[in-house]
Amino acid sequence: MTDLALIDAGGANLGSVRYALERLGVEARVVRDAQGLQGAERVILPGVGAAPEAMARLRAQGLIEPLQQLQVPLIGICLGMQLLFEHSEEGDVDCLGMLPGIVRHMTPALGIRVPHMGWNQLVPMRDSALLAGLPERASAYFVHGYAAPVTADTVAACDHGGLFTAVVQSGLRCGAQFHPERSADTGARILRNFLEMSFP
């Protein structure tokens, strides 16, 4: 069985992500410091809340550099995905810098509410094993007011007043802006794909 580390960065979705993994028959150990990452074969960084507080917590736990230097597959979920980018407009905070791009506040418009809450369709942008087995018009559940831009690393986008990154992968670094633990079959498939796929 894969040694799976689930980082406690203070997000309220930690328990629900853990339960989603248990439904897949996978047990994760909760990690709160750099020592806990030792021996991990896969790492999940969940997160709910604000980027400045999450980065401060990771810094207090001594996890910034260990995450940046990680040599095993990592997936960030929701705020956890945003933290993988260079910077966030939320609190004007520098993030982990593991993916290029700046996370920006979503702009409300006629018929476009911010925060973006609810089910929305994924728009595939390129091939990735992260999307294996998903139906053509798969939908996922989103709750966020900030979003990462579409880049060359974007695997799937989503449209809410403009396209943003919904799923990202660059080498060992992956992310999902939506909540897999609240996205029914789509979320379960993404988590299973991350745990089982081969990485370069």
Swiss-Prot record:
Complex formation: Heterodimer of HisH and HisF.
EC assignment: 4.3.2.10, 3.5.1.2
Cellular component annotations (GO), alphabetically ordered: cytoplasm
Species: Xanthomonas campestris pv. campestris (strain ATCC 33913 / DSM 3586 / NCPPB 528 / LMG 568 / P 25)
Pathway(s) where this gene product acts: Amino-acid biosynthesis; L-histidine biosynthesis; L-histidine from 5-phospho-alpha-D-ribose 1-diphosphate: step 5/9
Keyword annotations of the record: Amino-acid biosynthesis, Cytoplasm, Glutamine amidotransferase, Histidine biosynthesis, Hydrolase, Lyase
Function summary: IGPS catalyzes the conversion of PRFAR and glutamine to IGP, AICAR and glutamate. The HisH subunit catalyzes the hydrolysis of glutamine to glutamate and ammonia as part of the synthesis of IGP and AICAR. The resulting ammonia molecule is channeled to the active site of HisF.
Any one Gene Ontology BP term: L-histidine biosynthetic process
Top-level division of the source organism's lineage: Bacteria
Protein's cellular compartments: Cytoplasm
InterPro entries registered for this protein in UniProt: Class_I_gatase-like (IPR029062), GATASE (IPR017926), Imidazole-glycPsynth_HisH (IPR010139)
The keyword Cell division is assigned to this record: no
Residues of the active site: 78, 179, 181
Protein name as catalogued: Imidazole glycerol phosphate synthase subunit HisH
Reaction it catalyzes: 5-[(5-phospho-1-deoxy-D-ribulos-1-ylimino)methylamino]-1-(5-phospho-beta-D-ribosyl)imidazole-4-carboxamide + L-glutamine = D-erythro-1-(imidazol-4-yl)glycerol 3-phosphate + 5-amino-1-(5-phospho-beta-D-ribosyl)imidazole-4-carboxamide + L-glutamate + H(+); L-glutamine + H2O = L-glutamate + NH4(+)
HAMAP family with a match to the protein in the record: HisH (MF_00278)
UniProt GO MF annotations: glutaminase activity; imidazoleglycerol-phosphate synthase activity; lyase activity
Name of a matching Pfam family: GATase
Boundaries of every Glutamine amidotransferase type-1 domain copy: 3-200
CDD domains the record matches: GATase1_IGP_Synthase
